[in-house]
Amino acid sequence: MDAPPPPGAGTPAGAPRGRSPLARFVLTVILWLPVTFVVWYLVSPALMWVVKLVAAVAVMPFGDLVRTVEQTGSTLQFVTSLKPGQAAGAGVVSVSVDGLLYSFGMPMFAALTLSAREQARWKLLVIGIAALVPFVTFGVIADFLKNVAITAGPLVASQAGFSAPQREMIAFAYQFGTLIMPTVVPAVVWVVTHRAFLERMRGATRTPSA
């Protein structure tokens, strides 16, 4: 008769004996979340600086609609060529977007990555955060476009020059970038970068056959 496997065999690294590896992982994620959210909040100006650079390139197809993209802390300001009124010299419209609203998936990804305790976790963390930057930029730009094309009023919206179908697309992009991408995309990126960990977790939690 074959000898039984040693206790804890097949469990992911760091999983304690006598406790479900999945339960331990979930608990570790919960413990990491406050830490990663605090760090994310503190370093958000640096993260938004990267988003600002990407956004400045991404708005180029809109021509002279956006004159420049500026930053104050974690808030990005899109300085446009649109006039707030009909009077000459009345200034231009500037739209502020809070980048924190679209980047809170980053600390979630960090908590999952650090809880998995993979040997290359710091490399995976950097890769994952970098992969999330374009999606954060998408949400920020969709918010900006929603403001100038829909919520800014007919005078400003008419200057922006978007058609009715384009405004519908902007509204959809805004909803998608606000409700779906900040939570779903980090989870997808984590799954893609941690397939080996998930395979080990599945093997460790599989019920042995009789």
Which residues does each PLM region occupy?
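Hydrophobic N-terminal alpha-helices or hydrophobic patches in metabolic proteins across all domains
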Residues: 2-210
